[in-house]
């Protein structure tokens, strides 16, 4: 397509001397697709522009937060209005109350909420709360589910069905890892094995109700309800990590869509409107154990800062039940178009969706867990990624990340994307 990435290349060369790997978050290094990262300059609506002047239809959307698209006029105006009065006070502001009330109205399981500054803070704090509330030590998580970079969550499974964790990153103490039990996603039998062996010491089960960091992998029928049933049976807490799915999958989050009520919920991304944010909330009797109303400590200098609260509030105000019907309609069209193109050109492809979260894998096998996701054709994805970028479509630079839709994506954007996929599949056909 004759695109130049020379300025991005030069910027990355400089960045590698300044930051570990040249980036402030590993996925931005584009290692999974074997190419240099693209440096972005600005965005508007569903479009972004790199420092070389190339335009893209954006399906990354800052990894999910920008559900209204880039620089939404009302969100930007609200941030500017608040910034003129003060960016942070280290004291409470009215907008914290407003956002908390709106979240609780749309997600009834969140009776009380605590704002923090990142999804990682939210999940770490929720685990501490679960342990403090139950007086137990162990946490169950699922293989391939990412819950931030807290020590007790950077854990992988061993060779057994239900195993005590081993550190997945240097620097995580084995003692910390030993209190994390990892089991396969969408596998209720393995959960039962874990509880039969460790149930008296399991404080909680943390799960992405739709997995979003092994690609997009929805829960199978009965999986989430099965988790609800077994946690209630053993007196453990069910924690939904809705940092990604919250207000993306549905107007009432994934828990509303699937009709399963957790004890605690972690939020982030969308509720900050593109600014750093996180939150955790749930049953009042559990949440009131957090300081200063209870003994379980958690604090943050910028928690509930007025800029993020305002951006999140304005974002949620613009989302209606009809917004999610539009997401479904556009998602249906993308799935139809991309799946048909794959069939036409003999490309093995499995398409997964949940609300405005989209994932596809270069494999004929149904993807229901991390082991299957890992068997997708990663080399083909890398080729596909580079070709799509050259045609002006910005996708996540990893097979194991989802695509996102925004209210700013037009039918024309969707049709151009499908036409581009058709051209790229024809070129990649083998």
Curated annotation (Swiss-Prot):
Homodimer. It comes from Bacillus pumilus (strain SAFR-032). Pathway: Porphyrin-containing compound metabolism; protoporphyrin-IX biosynthesis; 5-aminolevulinate from L-glutamyl-tRNA(Glu): step 2/2. Pfam families: Aminotran_3. It comes from the Bacteria. Its EC number is 5.4.3.8. Keywords: Cytoplasm, Isomerase, Porphyrin biosynthesis, Pyridoxal phosphate. This is Glutamate-1-semialdehyde 2,1-aminomutase 2. The gene is hemL2. Belongs to the class-III pyridoxal-phosphate-dependent aminotransferase family. HemL subfamily. It catalyses: (S)-4-amino-5-oxopentanoate = 5-aminolevulinate. It is found in: Cytoplasm. HAMAP family: HemL_aminotrans_3 (MF_00375). Its cofactor is pyridoxal 5'-phosphate. One of its GO terms (molecular function) is pyridoxal phosphate binding. Signal peptide: none annotated. InterPro entries: 4pyrrol_synth_GluAld_NH2Trfase, Aminotrans_3, Aminotrans_3_PPA_site, PyrdxlP-dep_Trfase, PyrdxlP-dep_Trfase_major, PyrdxlP-dep_Trfase_small. The modification N6-(pyridoxal phosphate)lysine is found at residue 269. GO terms for cellular component: cytoplasm. GO terms for biological process: protoporphyrinogen IX biosynthetic process.
């Amino acid at each position: 397509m004759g695109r130049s990435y020379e300025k991005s290349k030069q910027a990355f060369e400089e960045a590698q001397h300044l930051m570990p790997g040249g980036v402030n978050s590993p996925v931005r290094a584009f290692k999974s697709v074997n190419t240099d990262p693209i440096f972005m300059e600005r965005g508007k609506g569903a479009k972004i522009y790199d420092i070389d002047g190339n335009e893209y239809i954006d399906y990354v959307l800052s990894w999910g937060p920008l559900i209204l698209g880039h620089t939404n006029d009302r969100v930007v105006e609200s941030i500017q209005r608040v910034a003129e009065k003060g960016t942070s006070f280290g004291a409470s502001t009215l907008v914290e109350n407003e956002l908390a009330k709106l979240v609780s109205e749309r997600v009834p399981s969140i009776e009380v909420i605590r704002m923090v500054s990142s999804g990682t803070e939210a999940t770490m704090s929720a685990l501490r709360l679960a342990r403090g509330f139950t007086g137990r030590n162990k946490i169950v998580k699922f293989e391939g589910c990412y819950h931030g970079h807290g020590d007790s969550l950077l854990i992988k499974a061993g060779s057994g069905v239900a195993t005590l964790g081993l550190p997945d990153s240097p620097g995580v103490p084995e003692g910390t890892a030993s209190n994390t039990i990892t089991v396969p996603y969408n596998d209720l039998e393995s959960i039962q094995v874990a509880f039969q062996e460790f149930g008296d010491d399991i404080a909680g089960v943390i799960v992405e109700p739709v997995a979003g960091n092994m690609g997009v992998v929805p829960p199978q029928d009965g999986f989430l309800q099965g988790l609800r049933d077994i946690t209630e049976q053993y007196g453990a807490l069910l924690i939904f990590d809705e940092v990604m799915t919250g207000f993306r999958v549905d107007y009432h989050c994934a828990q509303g869509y699937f009709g399963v009520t957790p004890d605690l919920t972690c939020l982030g991304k969308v509720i900050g409107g593109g600014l750093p944010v996180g939150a955790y909330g749930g049953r009042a009797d559990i949440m009131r154990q957090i300081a200063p109303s209870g003994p379980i400590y958690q604090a943050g200098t910028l928690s509930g800062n007025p800029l993020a609260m305002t951006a999140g509030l304005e974002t949620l105000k613009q989302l209606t039940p009809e917004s999610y019907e539009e997401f479904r309609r556009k998602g249906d069209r993308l799935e139809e178009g991309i799946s048909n193109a794959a069939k036409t050109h003999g490309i093995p492809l499995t398409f997964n969706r949940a609300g405005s979260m989209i994932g596809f894998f270069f494999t004929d096998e149904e993807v229901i867990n991390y082991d299957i996701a890992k068997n997708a054709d990663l080399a083909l994805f890398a080729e596909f990624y580079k070709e799509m970028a050259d045609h002006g479509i910005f996708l996540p630079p990893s097979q194991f990340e989802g695509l996102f839709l925004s209210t700013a994506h037009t039918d024309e954007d969707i049709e151009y994307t499908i036409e581009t996929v058709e051209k790229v599949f024809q070129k990649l056909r083998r």
